[in-house]
Structures are given as structure tokens and as C-alpha cells.
Amino acid sequence: PLWKVLDPVRRHSGRFSLQFSVSVEIVPEPDVFLVLETPEAFSVSVNGTELPETDCGFWVDTSFRKRSLNGLLRTGENTIVLSGTANPKIELESLYVIGDFGVRTEDNRAFVITSRKSVVLAQNLVEEGFPFFAGTISLTQSFEMNLSASGQAKLVFDDPQFVVADVWVNGNNAGQVVWSPYEVEIGRFLVDGTNTIRVDLVNSLRNLLGPHHHAFGELLGVGPDSFSDAENWTDVYQFVPFGFGGARVIVES
């Protein structure tokens, strides 16, 4: 882990290089980026080619700067080398590869960039190719319904594992679900016949930023030491679920 490298690098007096491996099954399109902090302090090469220094904006936070990886990744193993000059104040932070793709893993240790699924199970999107995802995912489902005369109905979420669910029914915003009871009134937007519900699920930054390697998994309190607790370290990445166990339309007579 990077935190174990930081102290030796700070004590070092010359140049240093760190090598990272990225496994790719399907090269992402159209755009893919490498994200790093303080890029001006380093030089980066990808598969032996110098990474262009053109700034492509920020991601998540203004300190997270994007550099284009277009044309540099290939199927199989890719090598990213981060080089710099050691000094007592240097910081080493995680690197991120971002784009429109899915991530496959068998053991939560090794990960492979692959195609993004278009059909998923909502119970846990972490296991559907989105282990490090942070943001909003839109899930859509159509169904047939014979609407009762009262028109009263609600959408109820079972086992919610999200921060916010923004619910849309036939193109109309029915409201946001953020706490118990995890339900929203949708009757006024339903029609006889085919209905389409879209749920925009929002999660936190936990699966993206961690801590990923604490043996206790999800911690009740997180501080700087939570990311470098050697006594409770595990090489297996620890994620929290993202999704919901089920969603039911309940018609009230």
C-alpha cells in the first residue's frame, strides 16, 4: 500500500518510481482518464509512453486532476509508472482510472476493467460491476398495471442500501426517498397499461475513497489511522452494499 511507501520516499534524497498494474479486458470508450493529485510533482508513463500533461479538468474534488489515457491502454496488463523527486514534504495519494466501464473481480483482491452491464440486479450494484462507483446510477423498469379507481399507490423499497433514491414515474418526478419509511407516493402518475419507473440511486464516496482494507469492514468512526491500521489490515477490499433488496408497487383501495 502507498502509506507504507510514503515514509521511505520522504527519507530518500533522489528520484523514485512507483509501478502500478491495471488489467483491462475491454478498453473503455470513448474517453478514459487517469486521476491524480498534485500532478505537477510527478511524471507519469503508461506502457512506456509519457502521459500528456494536458489538464482535463477535475473529478470529485478540484484537487483531483484528470489526464487523458485515450490511446494508451490496451487489453491485458497495463503498466503505469509514477516518478518524482523525493523530499520530506511529498505526498503520495491513490491514482484512479475513470471512464464508462465496468469492473470485474472474483475475490475482491484483483480487479479487471471490462464492459459496463446494461442489465443488472439491484440488490447490490457492487457485485454488478460497480465496486468503486460513486455518484448516481439510473435503473429503469417497465410493467403492466390495471389501475384502481382510487389511483392511490406507493413504491416501497425493501432493504435500502443507498443515500438517496430519486423516483420518476412515466417521466414525472414522484419525489426523493432518503429515510424511513422508504417509500414514495406514485399513484397520481400511474396510467392503465404500461408504466415505466426510473430510480436514480445515489451512494456515498465510501466505496471510492475507503477505507478499503480494514478487517472490520464498515467502521462506525473513520479517521486518518483507519486507512493505515497495520494490525487490522486485510488485502481483501472491503465494500459496503449499494442498491435495494426489492421495490414493490402497493395499490391502496
Predicted regions and their residues:
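Soluble catalytic regions of membrane-associated enzymes that act on cell-envelope
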Residues: S17-S21, T49
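Aromatic-lined ligand-binding clefts that engage carbohydrates, nucleic acids, or primary amines
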Residues: V22-V46, I80, F143-N170, I197-L201
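Hydrophobic core positions of the immunoglobulin-like beta-sandwich fold
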Residues: N70, I186-G187
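An acidic-aromatic loop/edge-strand motif
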Residues: P1-R15, T38, P52-T62, R67-S142, ...
